[in-house]
Amino acid sequence: MAFLTILVLFLFKEVLCEPCICENPTCLGITIPQAGFVRSAPGGVLLTETITERPQLTEWTTSRPKLEETLWLDGETKNGKVSQTLFEAIQGTQMENCAVKAVLDTTFVNLTKQDIVLGKIKVSEFGGDSDISKCGRKGLKVFICGGTVGYVTRGCPPEECKGKKGRMMALEPTTDCGVEKGLTTDRIKTGMLDITSCCTQHGCTKGIRVEVPSPVLVSSKCQEVTFRVVPFHSVPDKLGFARTSSFTLKANFVNKHGWSKYNFNLRGFPGEEFIKCCGFTLGVGGAWFQAYLNGMVQGDGAASADDVKEKLNGIIDQINKANTLLEGEIEAVRRIAYMNQASSLQNQVEIGLIGEYLNISSWLETTTLTKTEEGLMKNGWCQSNTHCWCPPKPTIVPTIGYVDSIKEVTGTSWWMVMIHYIIVGLIVIVVVVFGLKLWGCLRR
């Protein structure tokens, strides 16, 4: 009886779990927008925001061997005179021509390139000495827009900053002879509050705007101070890797800068096709579905995050070889993250901009690598068809929400779930009957 049960279980596994061959198997379907990370808006829509390294990307990437070895990450040390404004202090530094678009609040709606979005900074209701008036170990963060005026803001940028390049900077004291409090707070406390609604073509968002003069260096110990000028939002982390259209952003899962990394939840999977193609174990103790692609493989033949990372790095190496790009440009490519296949037109335009910067526009003519999957598979990037992913029809738009059906959890129809329980039930019955008979034999 036990043998027959095992045989039936094996047959069911072969029938239900036979790896499928997709009409258009996706070994690595990715898009490469200019954004570094994605963030979620209400409703779970995937958005991208740019960390802009224009206007001189090629110049400062090709003049140095590696970006990680430059002063971009650590800032620049500079001597500044007492009572010098931050805008004046950064003149002649690497940050002078740096435009940074930073979003620290995931409640914003999508914005255009002409919009300059500033960080989420706590302010008091009446513009008093709240967080914006404190320097702390990290220095005071301030946005500089087209002159000697600095802005510390939450919500909407000042109107005069719309469409202009700006610098989001922090000033950090580096010596004891430097700054007592980092920056003077007297002028900051006089900032004006403007609680209004900020509207773009994509919608409106309410926010508090605090307009302040540029902060001034202050010290009673010496005539000059030593400080470090750093970008407000540093270079993004190394890429997270995920399969196209098979992930969503987990709500409230953001790093310290407010940027969401790629994370799976159960609603992001295309259902039965994903399970059949990527493999799972139908049996007691086996994984019904691959809930998270975080390096821990659940199921037979499912690719891990490291697998995908290796593929992407291999492709980048091919780009390097084919186009003889400099190492600095390759590092720039590695720092460009990707989002799901349902890219907006804006992102597709930005893809072309990257191609112009890196002189690989011909390689980026298509937004995904779907046309080259066959070649990639022949080159060994896909170990087998079970390592490829079948794009669902239609493409699922990731959402964040509650699971309200069994198929969303298992990716499997209810009748398959019932078959599983029936098989497990038969096994339990066989084990119980066999145990009772064995117990009776022992008692005799």
UniProtKB/Swiss-Prot annotation:
Matching InterPro entries: Fusion_F0_Isavirus
DNA repair in keyword set: no
GO CC annotations on file: host cell membrane; membrane; virion membrane
This protein's UniProt keywords: Disulfide bond, Glycoprotein, Host membrane, Membrane, Signal, Transmembrane, Transmembrane helix, Virion
Signal peptide span: 1-17
Regions of this protein lying in the Extracellular compartment: 18-413
Compartment(s) where it occurs, according to its Swiss-Prot or TrEMBL record: Virion membrane; Host membrane
Keyword field contains Disulfide bond: yes
Residues annotated as site: Cleavage: K276, C277
Segments in the Cytoplasmic topological domain: 435-444
Glycosylation site list: N110, N359
Pfam families, per the entry: Fusion_F0 (PF13044)
Name of the protein in question: Fusion glycoprotein F0
Organism placement in taxonomy: Viruses, Riboviria, Orthornavirae, Negarnaviricota, Polyploviricotina
